[in-house]
Amino acid sequence: MSLRYLPLLAAALLLTACAAPQPRPGEGVDVGEASSLRSLIPAAELEKAASLQYSQLKRAAADKDLLAPDNHPQVIRLRRIAKHILPNAARFNAEAKNWQWEVNLIISKQLNAFCMPGGKIAFYSGIIDNLTLSDDEIAIVMGHEIAHALREHAREQMAKNKLTQTGAAILGALVGGGELFRLGGNLMTLKFSRDDESEADLVGLDLAARAGYDPRAGITLWQKMDAASNGAPPAWLSTHPGGEARIAEIERNLPAVMPLYEAARKPR
């Protein structure tokens, strides 16, 4: 493709975005198609970069005795919750069934969690311990982070960054030459748009409900988060709206996911 057509392509892709429809009772959330912009970034290279950064994180944590072992009670807990959530991941991204999923715990006071492209999940012990998270609340956090990976928000954001910061010609050279992430930044600290964050909230709510975790835990989670941060979003979700707005959006979408929860609920 000629580079002179790339800005026109980007504009056309942006115009394909559409607003999220109203929730339909009992049918789960409908967030539409993922952004076509993500096609500007090769998924395989992004997942390779994510896997490398995740390995580096684990190695650095292990060197400081901060990587929780496999027999740590919270690691066992996190992996059990993930085991319930992940069977529904392909509903939002068919490629998820081919990802090499990992779940690990970093011993840190940070209120943080993430899921990198390709299914690399990490929780920091601070978000579990400081907020005294229930299994349902952990499922909401985990579902949200998994949703970012399933909806390929990092891939979309990097495409936007390249279009904005380096121009269409450089983007074309990067994609064509395989030097994708030299200017890409740290995938663990990549900031998503508010729309992406809101979408991840809804998809995460759906994933948790289908796994048999109470989606109403999103309300208590944000009450705890607000109390811990004096009403300001922590670094974990710094681009989000405040707790009151988030709780209102969760409540608005509960009719779409509560029947899923009721159908999936079983003793744990």
Explain the meaning of each model-derived region.
Residues R4-A12:
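Sec-dependent N-terminal signal peptides
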